[in-house]
């Protein structure tokens, strides 16, 4: 590394360009966990612009989720949320995994995880969200992950804690320089988050 004048600890930026295959509805790029989640959040906010909602919405782009959910902890201290929707790019299993073991696949909608190593998502909130998706005909997937972690862990355990769920856009080869996602899953995630925000009010929050 010294021959290339690269010091330990210096950042590396993969030379990957975003690419869109409109014919197949595929999205290609780097760091979709969590760029694709951030993009879905921004698109949902854009579509909700000017609309009256039953709740106040604060959107956060937090840093360092992969190394201890540090940014979300700072956000919780500043915002003090009553409830949270965590958006991310979640791993898709539909590559070399046996069909019976696939929990998350492309073109089947956002993934709502019940738990992973870091968190058990608020059960009543999770069930309410899944029932809402079924009522509105929005496709969603459910999973229980043996690894991983996300900002819901910090949100539910910082200060007084706030109920949290995770809406993940499925991503093949997450955490790599070349990720794959789909327009279908992106759009379904945006629609689901909009539906949640249009239906969350004080009574709903108290029920969790």
Functional labels for PLM-detected ranges:
Residues 1-208:
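N-terminal hydrophobic/helix-forming segments and targeting peptides
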């Amino acid at each position: 590394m010294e021959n290339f004048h690269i010091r330990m600890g210096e950042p590396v930026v993969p030379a990957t360009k975003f690419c869109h295959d409109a014919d197949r509805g595929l999205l290609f790029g780097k760091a979709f966990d969590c760029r694709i989640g951030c993009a879905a959040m921004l698109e949902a906010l854009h579509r909700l612009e000017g609309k009256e909602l039953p709740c106040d919405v604060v959107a956060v782009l937090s840093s360092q989720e992969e190394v201890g959910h540090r940014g979300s902890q700072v956000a919780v201290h500043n915002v003090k949320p009553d409830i949270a929707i965590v958006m991310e790019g979640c791993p898709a299993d539909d590559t070399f995994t046996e069909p019976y073991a696939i929990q998350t696949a492309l073109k089947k909608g956002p993934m709502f995880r019940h738990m992973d190593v870091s968190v058990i998502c608020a059960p009543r909130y999770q069930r309410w969200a899944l029932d809402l998706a079924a009522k509105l005909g929005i496709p969603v997937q459910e999973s229980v992950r043996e690894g991983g972690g996300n900002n819901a862990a910090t949100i539910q355990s910082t200060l007084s804690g706030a109920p949290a769920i995770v809406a993940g856009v499925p991503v093949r080869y997450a955490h790599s320089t070349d990720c794959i996602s789909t327009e279908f899953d992106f759009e379904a995630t945006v629609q689901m988050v909009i539906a949640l925000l249009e239906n969350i009010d004080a009574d709903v929050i108290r029920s969790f």
